[in-house]
Regions:
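Active-site neighborhoods of metal-dependent hydrolases
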Residues: 1, 7-28, 75-79, 83-215
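Hydrophobic, small-residue-rich alpha-helical packing segments that form membrane-like cores
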Residues: 1-80
Length: 215
């Protein structure tokens, strides 16, 4: 409670100093670990000042809580804090939710009709760009920062679990063939290659190649 009150104080001070609103990245660590009620507490300071709550929602497909659980969370934050809501980004990002665009947009429209000021942004291309950890790593493996993640990798059981869960993530999205490493300063020869190609070079599985790149 003490930490949350301090966060509210910092949020209020920043808004009063000219910040346009509050932004969260609930898809990413460490933002992912924030509870909904904690975000609402901060968003209340936004609502009091008629400013904007912008969120990279917790899940854009089927990685963790699911697309519609995530969208409804953003709506509930706006409803309970009385602030404007901006969704980043409006998309159905996993095969499991492909074809759900109408349902997604209808939920936004129904929310507007309810009186909640909600909108979203969308980029006009089929690829996305993010960190390898955000795209593939299970959230439990990131909770202690890079040092803890490396400890997990050094443990045989945890490494096996990581490989299994990353492999499962491939099956829910574009697959290892759909992920391209754009920048890798440790070995620039791997830049521009897919994880399938890199796994072939390393003579290992795509999930194991992912861990080696992170290390």
């Amino acid at each position: 409670a003490e930490e949350l009150n301090y966060m509210r104080k910092l949020t209020a001070e920043s808004l009063d100093a000219g910040a346009l609103g509050l932004s969260t990245g609930l898809f990413y660590a460490p933002g992912y670990y924030a509870r909904t009620d904690e975000v609402i507490a901060l968003a209340e300071e936004v609502g009091k000042r008629d400013k904007l709550y912008s969120t990279h929602q917790r899940d854009e497909g089927s990685r963790t809580v699911g697309l519609f659980v995530s969208l409804n969370e953003a709506i509930e934050i706006g409803r309970r804090s009385d602030c404007k809501v901006q969704i980043s980004h409006v998309k159905c990002a996993a095969q499991k939710v492909w074809g759900k665009s109408y349902e997604y947009l209808q939920l936004l429209e129904d929310t507007v009709q309810e009186g909640i000021d909600i909108a979203g942004d969308q980029y006009p291309y089929t690829a996305s760009s993010t960190a390898l950890t955000g795209a593939l790593f299970p959230r439990w493996s990131l909770s202690g920062g890079r040092e803890k993640t490396l400890e997990f990798m050094a443990d045989e059981d945890h490494r096996g679990r990581l490989v299994d869960e990353i492999t499962d993530t491939f099956s829910k999205g574009r697959g290892a063939e759909g992920i391209i490493i754009a920048r890798y300063v440790e070995d620039e020869s791997l830049e521009g290659k897919t994880l399938i190609e890199i796994a072939d070079i390393m003579n290992t599985s795509p999930a194991e190649a992912t861990l080696r790149i992170y290390q």
